[in-house]
Amino acid sequence: MPPKTSAAPPQSDESDSDFDDAPVKKPQKKTTKPVNRHKEGSKDPEEELQRAVNEKFDGSDGEDDDSDLFSLQLPSRPDFLTKPNRADRLMIRNVEVDNFKSYFGKASIGPFHKSFTSIIGPNGSGKSNLIDSLLFVFGFRASKIRSAKVSNLIHKSAGRNPDKCTVTIHFQRIVDIPGHYEVVKDSEFTISRTAFQNNSSSYAIDGRPATKNEVEARLRRVDIDIEHNRFLILQGEVEQIAMMKPVKTTKSETGMVEYLEDIIGTNRLEPFVKLFQRRVNRLTCDLSQQRIARDHARNSKVAMENPVRAAIEFLMKENEATTIHMKLEQRRRQRYLDKIAPKQAELDKMKEEMKSIAETLDTNKNEYKQSEEAQKVMIEERSKLDKNFDSLSKELSDLGTEETRRKEALKRHQANISKAEAEKEKEVKKRSNLEAAPEKAERKIAKCQEEVEQLLEIEKTANEEADKNLDEFEKRSEAPKEEQKKIQETWAQKSNEFNKVRGEARIAREDFEDLKKLANSGTDKLIELKKRLESSEESYAKEKDELDKLKPEFDSWNDKLKQLSTELPTLRNTARQKNQDLAKTRDRLETLRQQNSSCSSSNKVIQALMKEKEAGRIKSFHGRLGDLGVIDPKYEGAICTNFGARLNYLIVGKEEDAKNVINFLVANKLPRQTVQPLDKIKCDKRDLAPNPTNPLPAPRLIDLIDCDPVLKPAFYDMVRSAIVGDSTQEAQRMHRMPACRGVTVCTLEGSMIHPSGSFTGGGKTVKGLILTDKNKMAKQVTPEDKAAERDLAEKLGKLRDEADELKGQEHEMDGQLIEARRKVAEMSNRLSIVTSSVQSAAPAIETLKKTIANQEKEAAKVKVDAKTLEDKQKIVEELEKKRDELGEEAAKVKARQAEIQSKLDGIFKELVQCHRDEAKESLQKRQKLEKDIAKETANISNSGRNIAKCDENISRHDKDIEKMKKKCEELMEKAIDDEEVKSKKETVERFEKQIKKLQTKGEEMTKKQSELSAAETKLEGELKKCSEGIKELKESMLADRLKVEDIEKKLAALKVNRIPRFQFLIESSRPEDLEMQIDDKMPVVDENQSPEEVERQKKHMACVMSDAAYALEFEMRQKVLENTESYENVDGEDRVPVELLSDEKINEISSRDAEEMQMKLKVCEQQVEALKAKVDISSIKAYVDKVKQYNEQVIKLTIATEVHRKHNQELQRIKQMRLEEFHSAFEFIGKHLVAVFKMLTDGGDAKLEYIDKDDPFRQGISFMVRPAKKAWKQIQFLSGGEKTLSSLALIFALHMFRPTPFYVMDEIDAALDYRNVSIIAQYVRQKTENAQFIIISLRNNMFELANRLVGIYKVDGCTRNVAIDPLRVCEMAKQITDSLGQATCTLPDEVTQRFNETMSRQNKEMIAQEKQYPNFPSSNEISKAEKIVNVEGRVRKELIQTTRDVTSRPQSKATTSGDGTERPASRSASRPESRINQMKYPAPRLVERSSSQNVRSPRKARNIEADETTPPSKRSNSASTPKRSPMKPLTPSSKKKEKAIVDDDDDME
């Protein structure tokens, strides 16, 4: 199939299944993973390679991502270029379709021939559905299969609507043998695809479900090129290759170079070329920027040399002043040291006395400590007793609870047993009733049947009696009916007269009323007008008064509305601000209350201990451990679940306070607590550091706790070095790591892995034992906090009152505003109505007055005669009187008629209706009895089933009762042993006695500790007195030492400046002043080089020399940096400390020397102060920084140059590799293209050539074609048939380069003439034995050469097919005719021979019968003329070609490309020459016409056999007319000659 011009649409109307996507490459996301070669043993190396390239590159020109491009490995060449040729090949055996498109049910298309199979059939029969079936299996979208969605592929016809369709392709590998083939063992496989009505589809390989990717991989492994689809050429697509541009102009289309690159496989290198090209472009830009940065750094460095010289001079003078100052301070320090020695002796004596007191105090403390240890043992013993006591108490409580539950369960089961037995009794009674039901039902049925028979008899008798009395009714009703008939006639006559008189009376009444109205019209109208005038005047007066009142009232309300509209927003803003203040104050108060509330611990123990701390009795009490630290809520479960008990410990600073806490708790009978003193916790400070020296793979719990540093040891003693992981799996993984050896690992949900490997966890996660919000940490509520809370509460109350008052004012004003708006709207509306009414009322009153005056005049004119009116009234009264009389007569007749009808109804009811009512009543009773019979019959039939159901229910109840009885027995067995309960109670009482005994012993110990504590207090007083004496001496000595230290600090602060030595600046030895030496290895410019090469080498030499110069300068500048530490900081922050003098030299300085040094110091300081404003000390450091920056830029430039060179070198290597691979394949394809096209066109020529040989991938490839006996043309300028031939030639040439196992083509011969179709058919049959061709064709000279024909036809709207081998049919026909003894031609060679003989004989007969005309040539003359034309045409062509070859050499009509191939001259250059040659060598047509004006041209002669698709019999009949020239036998040579004549005619035109 030709290349696709655009990618498939992302979505279609079909299913969203991935299997319906067209097999086109989709751009993948860009990634930086290296592209490695495919793994060994991969199922499809080419697929793995393409996937790897797609993961790395998406084909876009995006930005460079700075990844290491040299780590990428280039993909290897495609497998088809390297793997050896196989002896076997793939072929399609047949295609099975099931309800696919026009195929209903299962059908097998084929089997196909190994070489050439032709699909034939009439239009619309379903030939192209074969290609659609292949496309369907190969994974194309529905839109590519001439369908909107997948479900449309399912067969649909009259009465047939299957729910799915399936296509299965049978493949096999074969080895060709003469005339047949052998199937390779175990090479057969099938691929199928099924589509469903819901637009989904599925794949299968050998019947096994598979994915679309697996199908594509399997097809690639058998060399089916599903990427380019060259094996598939659809109808009308063969010419698309001709329409391809040399190179694509947009991303969606494909050019000739891309088309060939895809097939050759060099496109695998294109992403690498683009990637390296982007990197080289960026590196080139970076290189230019780096050179600019280097030059800028050098200029900045040179500009700072003069300020550096001045700064060095200043530093030297400053060092001189510092040295003098140092000598004076050293002399003063020595005087203070001489005072300290006597005081030190007295201090040593007092320390000895204090040591004796301290030893006595330690003895006392040891006794106290022993007492505490004994107390601690006692406390632990009591703790164990308390624990056992609580445990036994809980067991006793649990036993009681369990016994109560057992008794309740026993009671519940016994109740259920009673209930189940009652239900069972009900079912037993129901069963006995059901057993007796059939007998009762039978008796009732028999009784009902008897009643039914009686009712049937009554019904029958009543109906017979009714039918019998009908005749009697007819006899008795004859007289009344006659009378009724006469009365009806009378009534009709009276009714007509009444209607006639009524109409006359109505008309007369209307005339009278009209005349009466006319007489009164003038007077009535005048009265009405006067009333209206009076009413209008009265209304006008009222409305005018109302208008005068409304105007001032409206103005008043309007002013009020404006005032309220202005005041209300202001009031609302004030109220809003007040509410905001109220909300802020409320929030502050709530926050303060929460803080104060959280500070007051809810625990009574903590509260009581805090009071003791405030009283000063337990000074170092801190609180509960969990309240003293904060942790992230994420880790709350980890610490609370695993260390929950430790978080409840009470923390004190000293051990003695821990004892005081315990005594306090015991004395006040408070719950027992565990107290931990901080001074007894031993831990390494390094363990408390947030970042341990050996980092662990997860955070430590101790590092996650935020607390006071003083309390950190308490938390560390609890969690140690425990770390926390996210999950149990992660914890197990970390536990196995060497770094976590000996470390406890916790999880977020509360599990723990101990260092020994034991695992605990699985229970409920505990939370709430430690704070998760730092703001909630406990602190003491001070009086100031309480006062602040009261103040805020008072302020909140005031603000609330003010806000309520403002809110009330706002509501009141809002109501006033609404009322004002309503009033203004009402008054405005009323004012406009009244104003309009007043304005319109005055003109209306004037109009009414004028109308009244006119009406008075009109009334005087209208007068009616009173006599006429009286006569009319008499006529109306007479007619109405007559109407009433006739109406009374008609009513009497109608009443008589009703009497007669009533009499008739009575007779009918007496004789007939009574019997019918009786029959109807019997029928209703009978129907009711029949329903009862049916009901009882159903009860009889259902009785067995109901009894079985009752039996089942009884059995179920029995099982339930038995089950519940067993449970009751089990519960009875579980009764608690009273002896065991009694024993446990005795143990509890014993524990209580032991606890009381320990409590008494504890009180005694507490008393002894109080006595020891008093003695300790006395000794501490004496020790304190000695300590104060020592303190006074120390303070005196400290004052002297402080002065010495102060002097020493000043001496230590005295520093001299480092004086840098910039020797090369003083000598002015610059690199730019040195002479540059040119290296002998530099390339020399050759005079034979092109100007571009010379210019390129000049630029290269300039860059090399510039880099060498700066490298030399870099070496010189580096000397400045050799001593960087000696002058790196010369601004006073980190200068060199001054060298101090020895004590001997200090003692040698006399007072006179000191005074002289003071004077000299002042002079130096004045000089330094004078120079300080003129110099910039920071210029020295800045200069050093500039030198460093310059050297860094030089190093960066060197590195950038080397990186650019390496990337550019790799880019050129990949480009060259791509070009060489492409060029070798390109030459192979081009050579075979020329050979194939020359064979197809009988002498034509075609070639693929580079538009730009240096870079064919940029400009592309042009496809040049020279049809036989014509000039060179671009393929897009050819005719349709020539385009088809050119495209097919390229397809066949590509087949030789990259063979495809099979080809499926749809009417590729549609645009070809008879001769070219035959050539294509012969080529397919003879020249391509290594492939299978399946061609759909309607041309007989194509399908007649096929090895096998598959006929497609339709029956009842469904497609069917049949396959035959033409040669086999002919052989069978030959055998049949031979067996019958008939000489009939059946084989193709025999038929051709017989046809040629028949043609020769008919031509001879035509010549013999031909009449001779003096003015017309004979047949022999015409034949001679044709031969002459043929010979002269060939001679003329050869002469023209020779002339072109001679003239093209000096005039350079053809150019030679870089690869040695000759390019044809342009059409404009060759056109004049061809015209000249036509003049030199006249056309053969002129010679032919000169012999006779009436002889047909060769073109017309060819029309004799123009339609060569006509059967031989018809062609022989058409040639039998005497006026046509004799026909020659059909041989290949004669056909070629005729075609040559036609081509000559085309050239002459």
Swiss-Prot record:
InterPro entries: P-loop_NTPase, RecF/RecN/SMC_N, SMC, SMC_hinge, SMC_hinge_sf. The keyword rRNA-binding does not apply. Residues 1-78, 396-444, 460-485, 1440-1549 are annotated as: Disordered. Residues 619-734 form the SMC hinge domain. One of its GO terms (biological process) is positive regulation of nematode male tail tip morphogenesis. One of its GO terms (cellular component) is condensin complex. ATP binds at G121, P122, N123, G124, S125, G126, K127, S128. It comes from the Eukaryota. Residues 37-59, 396-407, 420-444, 1460-1474 have a biased composition (Basic and acidic residues). Residues 326-604, 786-1058, 1144-1182 form a coiled coil. Residues 26-36 have a biased composition (Basic residues). Component of the condensin I complex, which contains the mix-1/SMC2 and smc-4/SMC4 heterodimer, and three non SMC subunits that probably regulate the complex: dpy-26, capg-1 and dpy-28. Within the complex, interacts with mix-1, dpy-26, capg-1 and dpy-28. Component of the condensin II complex, which contains the mix-1/SMC2 and smc-4/SMC4 heterodimer, and three non SMC subunits, kle-2, capg-2 and hcp-6 that probably regulate the complex. Within the complex, interacts with mix-1, kle-2, capg-2 and hcp-6. Interacts with smcl-1. Central component of the condensin I complex, a complex required for conversion of interphase chromatin into mitotic-like condense chromosomes. The condensin I complex introduces positive supercoils into relaxed DNA in the presence of type I topoisomerases. Converts nicked DNA into positive knotted forms in the presence of type II topoisomerases. Also a central component of the condensin II complex, a complex that seems to play a role in prophase chromosome condensation. Both the condensin complex I and II play a role in meiotic and mitotic chromosome segregation. PANTHER family: STRUCTURAL MAINTENANCE OF CHROMOSOMES PROTEIN 4, STRUCTURAL MAINTENANCE OF CHROMOSOMES SMC FAMILY MEMBER. This is Structural maintenance of chromosomes protein 4. It comes from Caenorhabditis elegans. The gene is smc-4.
